[in-house]
Amino acid sequence: MAALSKSIPHSCYEIGHTWNPSCFGSYLQITQGAMEESFKIYAPLYLVAAILRRKNLDYYVHKLLPELLQSTSFLTANGSLYIAFFCILRKLLGRFYFWTPGFGAALPASYAAILIERKSRRGLLTIYMANQATEALFRMGVTRGYIKPIRHGEVLLFCITSALYMFFFRCRDGLKGFAFSALKFIVGKEEIPAHALLPENMYVKAEQKSKEHRGLSRNSLKRLMDIICKHGPRHRCCKHYEDNCISYCIKGFIRMFSIGYLIQCCLRIPSTFRHLFTKPSRLLSLFYNKENFQLGAFLGSFVSIYKGTSCFLRWVRNLDDELHALVAGFLAGISMMFYKSTTISMYLASKLVETMYFKGIEAGKCPYFPHADSVIYAVSTAVCFHAAVMEVQNLRPSYWKFLQRLTKGRFALMNRKALDVFDSEASKNFNNFVPKLDPRFCIVKPELPLDFS
């Protein structure tokens, strides 16, 4: 708490924009760099999204560019307004306090910036930044000894989140939209309660028709596989009519393992092909990389454990119950041991909280707060900026790289050595970096002792 009462008399040039003594000149440089990088980030993102959603020609002609420029303006404003409020606060207060270089300057800048962005994107941005801020605050608590980290905590969080997600998935009107479609794709329609409304004889008839239509072209191996899959233990409550319980789980594992393996391969293609001509041997690493198999094992085991547990509980209890999804979902979450990811756990947990909150609003049990997404985004972004200034070691490395890219590397040029007086180890990861300042624009000369009032 003693650090909160301290202050330093340095100017905004000596602490913040050390590369340029002019506040306005620094603002223009940050704006230019942020605009270039924002456009590079959003241009391919919007183009790929439009292609995947199969937008018509009218969208490309009339809507794509305005939406792209709006998002670019939002991200540019978030960076440029931060340096603007950084200088404004210094001039208004006359000194720098613990909260002003990071949180104080980023809060109004982030709130003003998010109002520029389209409303349809604010919710997603809020969840993303809330995840970043929560992780940063957690690391701050661990650093200060306020919080004791739990071993495999991200796996435990994923287990709890998975259990609740699968329970809502099994309940009628529990999940809607993308979340429902995604889980339906992952675990299959056989686990949807509405699927039980379709009588078994419909599947038998469809199966017989497909046999008659394709019987001539099937080989003996295919026929043997059908016999193995369909002639085995299957509980009367199980809706996987074309498989027994064992083959149902095995097929689920193979399918999602293949999808996870291919996804990770596709993600590695750009970095691999950059070195195709200089190091051709790296092409083999695209297919034999450890992470490819880890993601495949994670997705495959998640589905097989969930399906296997669901079938087991139907056999044991002799009924199909939505509560089975809680147990099956929790056990399936252990599959994250193959592919540990705090990002995935935090994101899904945040989306779950959002889902439950909106369900509470629909039920009339939770109050609705207008502009809550904008406020949460502003506070979360301010926390992340504060961590980036005062204790970057507690910020997620990927977000620090993003800030560096957005500011063309200028975020690392801040005089964090002078901020060490606030006891946050601001210069810890910067090798005691001290910027070269023009003495003509300095309030505090390097050789003079500082007065911390």
Swiss-Prot record:
Cellular component, GO annotation: mitochondrial membrane; mitochondrion; peroxisomal membrane
Name of this chain's protein: Transmembrane protein 135
Coiled coil: none
InterPro entries xrefs: Tmem135, TMEM135_N
Family indicated by similarity: Belongs to the TMEM135 family.
Keywords associated with the record: Membrane, Mitochondrion, Peroxisome, Transmembrane, Transmembrane helix
Function as written in the Swiss-Prot or TrEMBL entry: Involved in mitochondrial metabolism by regulating the balance between mitochondrial fusion and fission. May act as a regulator of mitochondrial fission that promotes DNM1L-dependent fission through activation of DNM1L. May be involved in peroxisome organization.
Places the protein is found: Mitochondrion membrane; Peroxisome membrane
Organism expressing this protein natively: Xenopus laevis (African clawed frog)
Segments traversing the membrane: 68-88, 96-116, 149-169, 293-313, 326-346
Membrane association type: Multi-pass membrane protein
GO BP term, example: regulation of mitochondrial fission
